[in-house]
Amino acid sequence: MPRSVPVMTDVIQVTKRESTGTAATRRLRRDGHVPAVLYGHGEANEHLAVPSAQVKGLLRHHSKTVQLSGDVDETALVSDMQWDPLGIEVLHMDLIRVNLKEKVELGVPIVLHGEAVGVREGGMLLENVHEVEIRCSAGSIPDNLVLEVSELGVGEHKTAGDLTLPEGVELITDVDVVIAHIEAQRDEEIAEAGDALAEPEVISKGSGEADE
């Protein structure tokens, strides 16, 4: 079974922003940068610009913690990303100052692993919850948490307490929260599926009259 592994800390180059108005922010985005704000630890907020290409790298790597370089030398936690209405481009980032040893609380995604017995028996695997809240050191945040479902039968479920937790990771979400379950298909759903397989596809249909 795959193991949950900590995410490597990405290094991103940042520059300080002198102007923070709407017009300045639009120019920043046109120039290929994402505006960001760094805060926390009782220090003053820093308004930053991050290259869009590096933000895309964070998304590919599922990075939670980043090492800031350039105008600011800090370790930060990516606490929030604001997206455009289509969910394509990141419009803004919130970063929280952390040190890699301090404890942080955040949500991490769940990955279901294995082909459930109940699915092979004709049931449906339904995922009730897609992420859970955990507490761990900022330098040991896992990419995801794995839930083994291969032995799950029809009518059975797995809870947050069944998740595989890496060393040093504490579950905040209630252990009794149902993450996934196997539901039996209703008779009418099975009948409809059978009818769909039995009926040939009509490629074209004539009017019933012979061509003249």
UniProtKB/Swiss-Prot annotation:
Family classification: Belongs to the bacterial ribosomal protein bL25 family. CTC subfamily.
Q: What is the lineage of its organism?
A: Bacteria, Pseudomonadati, Planctomycetota, Planctomycetia, Pirellulales
Its name, as the record gives it, is Large ribosomal subunit protein bL25
InterPro entries attached to this UniProt entry: Rbsml_bL25/Gln-tRNA_synth_N, Ribosomal_bL25/Gln-tRNA_synth, Ribosomal_bL25_b-dom, Ribosomal_bL25_C, Ribosomal_bL25_long, Ribosomal_L25_dom, Ribosomal_uL5_bac-type
Q: Name one GO molecular function term.
A: 5S rRNA binding
Q: According to its record, what are the GO cellular component terms?
A: cytosolic large ribosomal subunit
Record keywords: Transferase included? no
GO biological process entries:
translation
